[in-house]
Amino acid sequence: KNSKADIHIGNVETIQQADTAKAVVTDVTQVVKAAMPCVVSITNEYTAYDYWYDEEYDEEANGSGIIIAQNDEELLILTNYHVVEDANDLYVQFIDDTEVVAYAKGVAPNEDLAVVSVLLEDVPNAALDTIAIAALGDSDALEVGEPSIAIGNSLGYGQSVTTGVISALNCDIFEDDEEINLSSLIQTDAAINPGNSGGALLNVNGEVVGINSSKIADYAIEGMGYAIPINTARPIVDELVKQETKRKVAVEKRAFLGISGTDVSEDAMEKYEMPEGVYVSSVLSGTAAEKAGIKKG
């Protein structure tokens, strides 16, 4: 496939007032038209475990991603680690609704960043013609009060756009029930809802200045969304894209332990007084695990 997704965004000029301040931007249609092709929807199919009923079940989660590069074999998509965490299967949907299989390439759990790969051979030429590679901006140049635009797969319903301003810079957030705690974030009042994680936070030039990552959820709180600054992400992403893409291995070539299990979350450790590690939900008969004396539970 020779089609190249090399369109860059960021051609909208900003008006200067008194040579010092940007005018208030209310019409972002041209910025959005240019930027939407570089944002994708991500579906994560994973196995969840109900400790109360002692059973596994299939679950699906939705997020977003930003197309940041293309090489000879693949498109590279930046997203949050929590969007792809524990995935059995990943799927990416482009702006034209084409959906293809995706693979984890590199992850940085502590920084809540990940790079996902889509093989070019899996993407129809027609779809390649509709997508774009994002222009990355300079998050260090952001100022409180300037306009911001968030694009993402809100609630899993497909791409949507919200606007606001940069509310604060260098913010730290900590949630007691979350393993990931982030610092030096961008705060915006552009709505960031479930499914927006991994999507793009743009400036008025259409440049990606942040990766939408989280929102403080409380009935008394409005307009507090957070994004990882693109300048913070750059050196991490530079290393992640060098890693080998993790493709599925044929069943007959896989190592086989003989158990079904799931990681014990911090929430489960607290609620059920379980130790840290892997909870064994079943042991297959005749396997090495059974012979070693591993038991269910």
Give, region by region, the residue ranges found by the protein language model.
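Conserved PDZ fold ligand-binding element
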Residues: I77, A289-G297
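Extended hydrophobic-aromatic, low-complexity segments
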Residues: A268-Y272, E290-G293
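Serine-dependent protease modules
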Residues: N2-D267, P275-E276, S285
